[in-house]
Amino acid sequence: MAQEFTFTVNGVERTTTENKPLLRYLRDDLNIHSAKDGCSEGACGTCTIHVDGAAVKACVLTTALAAGRNIVTVEGLPEDVREAFVYAFGAVGAVQCGFCIPGMVMAGAALIAEDPEPTEEQIKYAIRGNVCRCTGYKKIIEGISLAAAVLRGEKQIDEDLERGDDYGVGKRAFRIDVRKKVLGEGKYPDDIDELDQPGLTYASAVRSKYPRARVLSIDTSKAEALPGVVGILRAEDVPVNQVGHLIQDWDVMIAQGDITRCVGDAIVLVVAEDEATLEKAKKLVKIDYEPLEPVRNIVEARAEDAPRLHDSFFAFGNTVELKDNVCQSRHVTRGDAAKALAESAFTVTQRFTTPFTEHAFLEPECAVAFPYKNGVKVQSTDQGAYDTRKECAHMFGWDNEPERVVVETMLVGGGFGGKEDVSVQHLAALAAYKLQRPVKCKLTRAESLAFHPKRHAMDGTFTLGCDAEGNFTGLDCEINFDTGAYASLCGPVLERACTHAVGPYKYQNTDIRGFGYYTNNPPAGAFRGFGVCQSEFALESLIDLLAEKVGLDSWEIRYRNAIEPGEVLPNGQIADCSTALKETLLEVKDAYYAHPGHAGIACAMKNAGVGVGLPDAGRCKIRIEDGRAVVYAATSDIGQGCNTVFLQDVAEACGLPLSCIANGECSTENAPDSGTTSGSRQTVVTGEAVRGAAFLLRDAMFGIEAGKPAPAAPVSAHGDGAKIEYDDGRAYQLRSQELIAGQGMHPQDPAAAIKALEGCEFSYVYLEPTDKLGADVPNPKSHICYGFATHVVILDDNGRVSEVYAAHDSGKVVNPISIQGQIEGGVLMGMGYALTEDWPLKDCVPQARYGTLGLFRAPEIPDIHAIYVEKDELLPVAYGGKGIGEIATIPTAPAVQNAYRAFDGKLRPDLPMVDTPYSRARHRG
C-alpha cells in the first residue's frame, strides 16, 4: 500500500501518495498559483509560504516532509492581513512586475506575526532569501513596515487611494495591478492550467550539450513509443526554420547534419500529456554529436582562420552574405575628431571591458498556445505582442497573413530587454498548430540562464580630449561587442552604444566605430540601458581621469560641459526645452562635496523612443464598454507601470475617475500595434497616442453635454507632435494649455457623459519623425527626446557603498508613487553590474546558477535617495513625460568606479570590479 502524506493547506486537510516538491503539489494538484516557480532551486523566494507559521520556500520542501504540517499561502492569510498588504504595497509603490510579491508578502507576514513592530533591519533579514529585480527592495521594506503599522492600528487604510477618484497625471496613482499581484490572483502564462485549457499538453526542447558540434544523428523512437507522448517535432517539421527580431538567423531547431551554434540550441521538441512523461521522454531522445572547436570570444572571432558561424542571414526582405564573423557594424562621426584630439591640451586613452550579464527576471519564459480559427493563439510573457506575432507568422510562412497568429500578452514577471526575442512562444505555437492541441512550453531556470540573450560583453578603447579650461574637444573610440551565436538586437544595441558614447555634453568632434561579432557564446541582445551602460561606463570613467589632468574636480568638469536647452549635443541634435542635466548636477552637488575621498559621480543621457529615422508609432483605441473607457494598446507592462500611466492620461484628459476607465486585453486581435516595450518609449510614444484618443473621447463627451448625438462611426485622428489631423484630413484644434497637466477642460459630469457614448470608438496614432543615422542635415533629430541623470555614490570607511544620490530629469513625473521604485531598482541593478554580477563562461558554456549570479539581496542595499527634477517648460507630447525605465541604471556603475578611484586611487576599468569588499564576498560565495 502506498504511503500517504497528510497535511493542512489553507485550513483544508489534504492527502497525497506522491512524494514530490510541495511547490509542484500546490500548483499542479491544488491549482494554487500565488506560490510562483521562479527557480525550483531555493534561490529566489518567489514560492515562499508558511509552514507552521514560518516562512519556507515551497520548492525545497517535499510533500513527505510536509506531512503533519500546517501550510498557508497568500490565499489562506486572514483577510485583515491581506488587505493591509494590498494597501501598503500599493501606497508605497512596492509592486512592479509582481512575480516576487506573494513571496515577499508571506515573508513579511511571518515576521509581523512574530514581531508586530519590526525594525528595518529585521525586515531586511526576513526577506534576505527573496529576490526582487525591479524595486531595489526599498519600497518592499517600506511596504512591510506600513502593513505592520496598519495591523497594529497605528495607520489607517486610505480607501480613496485605491479607488482613484483623482487619478490624473502627476497624482499619486495606486497602480491598477496591485491587488491582483499582491494576492497572487493575476495570471502569468505558467498559471494557465487544465482548468483554463482542458486537454493541455506540455512541451520542452531537447537542447544541444555543445556550443559547436555537428548533429550526426537524432533517434526519437524510444521517446515516441512512451505512453503519454503526444508528438515529437524536428527541424523538418518547421516551415521556415529561422526566426529573429530583425535579422532572421536564429534556428528554430537544429537539423540532423547541421552544426549547433551555442549551448541550448533546440534540436527536437517533445510534447506530452503531463510534465512527468515529458521529462522521461526527453531522456529517451538519443542525439549523437561530433564536437567542434568553438569560437570563444571577440579575438577568436576576428582571427583570419576562424570558422564562420553564419554564411548569410535574412533581414528586411534581403539575404545578406557574410564574409566573416562581423554581425553588425556602425560608424558614427561628426566634425574632425583626429584634428580636435591632436590639438587638445589634454587627452586620456583607456581600454575598458564589461562582461555578459544576466537579466535575472524572476519569471522564467513561458507560453501557452492553442489552435485558433485558421491558425493559432499564443498567450505569452514577452515585451511585444506584435513582434511575437511577426516572428511566429514568419516561422509558419505566413508573412503575408500574420493575423493567423494571435498573441495575447499576459502578466509579465520582469523583462529588462530579455523578453524581446521569442524564446518559447514559437515552439508552443508550432506544437499547437501541428498537433491541434493546447500546449504549454516553458523554460526551466537553467534553460533560461543558458538560452535568452544577455547584455553584450564589451571590449573598447576610448580617447577623450579637452582644452586647457577643461572643455571637451573630441572623442575617438572603438567598441567591440560579443553578440554570441545569433544577432538578436545586435544592430540597434550597438547603435545606441555608439550614439550615446559621447555623453550628455557639448562638443562636436567624434569618431566612433562599433562592431558586433558572432561567437559560439549564448546570444546577447537587449538589456536595460540598451548598450549605453557599456559605453557610458567607459566615458564617465575617462572624464575623471581627464579632470585630474586639468586640475578640476569631477563635479566641476561635468557642470562646465553639461548640455543645456538650445545647445547642440555631440550627435548634432539640439537639446530641447525640457533638458535638465545641469539641474540634476545641482541636486547632488552638496552630497558630492560633503564626502571628499569617498564620493564618485557620473552623468548619463538616454533616448526615448526608437528614433534614428525608423517608424515608431504609438497607437491607441478607446472603446466605451459598460460605461467605461476601455484603453486598447498592445503594449506590454513588464513592471514599469505603463498600464497605469495610460489610465492616468485618460483621467487627465477627460476628468474621469478610475471607476470609469480600464485597460483592455493586450492582444493583437483587439488592440492596435503600439510597439515593443523597449527604449523607454511607452510613457512618451504610446502615452501620447492614449492622450490623443482621450481628447477625441473628451470632445464627444462635451458634445453629449451640449445635446449632440453620439458619433455614428469610429472617430480617428493622427499627430506628429506638432500638428493633429482627423483621418479625413480636417485639422484638429487644441489649446496649448490643454497639453499641460492640470490645465485641461473637462465635462461637467464625465461619468454621466461617457454612458451616453456606449459602443463608440476613438483612435489615435502618434508618429513623430526623426532623422536617420548619418543624415545629411546640420542638426539631425535622432530621437524624440532624451532623459538625463546624475548619480553620486558614497563609500563608507570600509569601502562599501553607503549612499547613492540619483537625480533624474525624466520630464513630467506621471506617477510619483512609481518613479522612486523605478529609480531605486535601476540604481541597485547598476551597482550589481559594477560590483557583483557576472555570468561566467567556460569554453562558451554558462557556469552560473540563479543563486550564484551575484544579485544584491535586501540586507546589502545602501540608502538610495531617488530625486526627480521637473522643469516648468516641458515637451508638448505625453504631458511632458520622458520615461525612467532605462536611464536609472546607466550612471551607477561609473559613479561606483569613480568613488573607488577617489577612495584608493585605483582605476578599475573592468567589470565587475575586483579588489573591493564586494568582490571578496563574491569569491567567498
Task: Describe each model-derived feature in a short phrase.
Residues P307-F396, N561-R628, Q648, D771-P780, ...:
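Helix-loop-helix junctions that connect adjacent transmembrane helices in secondary transporters/permeases
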Residues I49, K180, G186, C366-P371, ...:
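Short beta-strand elements
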Residues G93, K171, D177-L183, E321-A367, ...:
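Glycine-rich loop/linker segments at domain edges
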Residues M1-E162, V612:
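Signature of N-terminal electron-transfer/Fe-S-associated modules in redox systems
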Residues L411, G415-Q436, K440-K442, V645-D649, ...:
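Thiamine diphosphate
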Residues A235-E236, W398-R404, Y433-V439, A468, ...:
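C-terminal catalytic domains of large/alpha subunits in multi-subunit enzymes
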Residues V86, G108-I112, Y137-K138, S145-L146, ...:
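Short acidic, glycine/serine/threonine-rich loops at helix termini
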Residues A149-L322:
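Flexible, low-hydrophobicity surface segments
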